[in-house]
Amino acid sequence: MCGRFTLTSNLDELQGRFGFLSEFTDSHSFDHGPWLGPRYNIAPTQPVLTVTNDGQRRGQLMRWGLVPFWAKDLKIGARMINAVGETASAKPAFRAAFKKRRCLVL
C-alpha cells in the first residue's frame, strides 16, 4: 500500500465490474455519500469502499489502516499502511491479517 490513492469510478460502475451487493441505496446520503464517489486524495484512516466475500460479495466502507492484534492504541492504524508484498506473510504485524483477513480495496 502507499500513503495516498485515488478512486476514479462511481458506485454503479464498481458494482457492475465486481458484482457485489451493496447496503448503499443512495450514494449521496449524509452517512456515506462523500466516501462512495470518485476521490483523488484518499488518506489513511479515511473510510474506503471495500469488497468482502463471506459466501457472497458485499460492498462496505472500512477505515483504511491496520490495527495489529497486539496494539493498545487504535491510532497505530494510521501508521500501519505500508506492507511489502514479499514479506507481509512473515512480519508479525501483518502475518495474521495477510493469511485470514482479506478484502479488495477499491
What role is predicted for each listed range?
Residues M1-L106:
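Short linear sequence motif anchored by a di-proline
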